[in-house]
Structures are given as C-alpha cells and as structure tokens.
Amino acid sequence: MNNAQKILKQNPSLLRKLNSHFDLPEMEPQDILTALCQKTGKDFPALPETDYTVRYVHRSMQEYLSPAFYLTPPLDTRTPNIIYINPSDQRSNLELFTTLSHEGFPGHLYQTIFFGNTEPSDIRYLITSSGYIEGWATYIESYGYQYASNYLDDNDGSDYVCLTWLNRSINLCIYSLLDIGIHYYGWS
C-alpha cells in the first residue's frame, strides 16, 4: 500500500491513466508467449526447447470457463503443452500479457516442464498441492507485470505497470481476508 501511495504522490497523473484504461500495444498470444519465454531466461533456470500450442475455448464452453488455462500434459509423455484462451472474456492487453505469464512462462507451463526435468519420484506426481501450484503462478504474475513494462513507450510505463500490479495484489489480499472471514469466522 505504501508503494502505491509513494508512486501516486510522485506522479498523480498515473491515476488518470489507470482510469482511462491506458494499455499495452496489441500483441498476438503466441508473440506474448515467445517474448515471455525469452524474458524468463534472465530470471529463472533455462528449460530445454519446449513445444506448446495456443488454442481457443470452444464457443459452447466460453460462458463457463476462466479467461485462460494451461492443460497439464500426461505424466508419461509430458506433451502436449496447451494453453487455452477464452476469447469471450473482455480483458486489456496488459491483462492478457499477465494471464499468459501465469499460464505459460514463467507460470504453470514453465513450472510443469521444470518439475518434470528434475526426474522426481513418482509419488510426487500423485501428491499435488493446488495451493503450491497456484501460489507459484500468482507469484509469477509480478514478473509478468515487470516484463510488460518493456512494451510501453510512455515514460511512466514502469510506474503504471507497477501500480497496476500493486492494485491487483491488494485485491487478492482483500479476497483472501474475506474468504477467511466468511468461511472460518462465519461472517455474513
């Protein structure tokens, strides 16, 4: 919260940009994933050449599915690596970029490939923790926001993207507190 206040105090015009839906230039999902894969190499261990496919959710399922998801491949083949994008979801280019960082590189796809290459004991495939898996991908979104700032020509681009990320983080904290309050403490 203090970081957001500090950024806005130094540059109050960023609030107008947030409200005016200032955005990244439009990019194709495949181009975003290629860029993310390249940028990931600076911050995380390299992966072997990884094949992946981007597909779109069928019209009949668009109403019921999330904005995007990574389809985990079978254990014995580790392929195919598929990311589905829901085209019915209205999102900004920045949201698409960070969603693909969550689902692709350095998110779920990266995590799955990296884990598989460690040749873990078979028991580790049987015991999974969705908290660990989603925790990693949510943590990774901060990198997605950092990487996205490289695509803004605006002088305030990195501050704008940082402020957007901080806003998302604050919202996730609020959701968590409400979830605990409602389901543990019985708030109504």
Model-based region annotation:
Residues 1-188:
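N-terminal maturation segment of proteins
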